[in-house]
Amino acid sequence: MARKSLIQREKKRQKLEQKYHLIRRSSKKEISKVPSLNEKWKIHGKLQSLPRNSAPIRLHRRCFSTGRPRANYRDFGLSGHILREMVQACLLPGATRSSW
C-alpha cells in the first residue's frame, strides 16, 4: 500500500490541475494565435509562472484501493495485483479469467 503522504500529494496535484486548467488552456490557445515572437514569450512566461504541480503531465493514475501508481488498468481503476484478486473472488461483474 502506498504511503498516505504520497496519496495526499497526488490529491493536491489534482486540485491544482483543476484550478489552473482554464488558465493554462486559454494561454496555450493564445500562443497559437499570436503571430509575434515577443508576445509568445510573454504568454510563455505567464505559463511558467503557474505552479509546477498544476500541469496535467504531473498527475499519475493510482489504484483505487491501494494507491499503487504502477500497472493500473484504466477500465477498472485498479492495479493488476488487486484486479487479479478481485476477479478470482468474483467481485468484478463481467470479468472472466482467460483460458486457452
From Swiss-Prot:
Keywords tagged on the record: Chloroplast, Plastid, Ribonucleoprotein, Ribosomal protein, RNA-binding, rRNA-binding
Gene Ontology terms: cellular component: chloroplast; small ribosomal subunit
GO BP, one annotated term: translation
SUPFAM superfamilies named among the record's database cross-references: Glucocorticoid receptor-like (DNA-binding domain)
Cell cycle found in the keyword field: no
One Pfam family this sequence matches: Ribosomal_S14
Localization: Plastid, Chloroplast
Taxonomic superkingdom: Eukaryota
PANTHER family referenced in this protein's UniProt entry, alphabetically: 30S RIBOSOMAL PROTEIN S14 (PTHR19836), SMALL RIBOSOMAL SUBUNIT PROTEIN US14M (PTHR19836:SF19)
Role description: Binds 16S rRNA, required for the assembly of 30S particles.
Assembly and binders: Part of the 30S ribosomal subunit.
Family: Belongs to the universal ribosomal protein uS14 family.
NCBIfam families, per database record: PRK08881.1 (NF006477)
Name of the protein in its database record: Small ribosomal subunit protein uS14c
Species, as recorded: Morus indica
Source lineage: Eukaryota, Viridiplantae, Streptophyta, Embryophyta, Tracheophyta
Gene: rps14
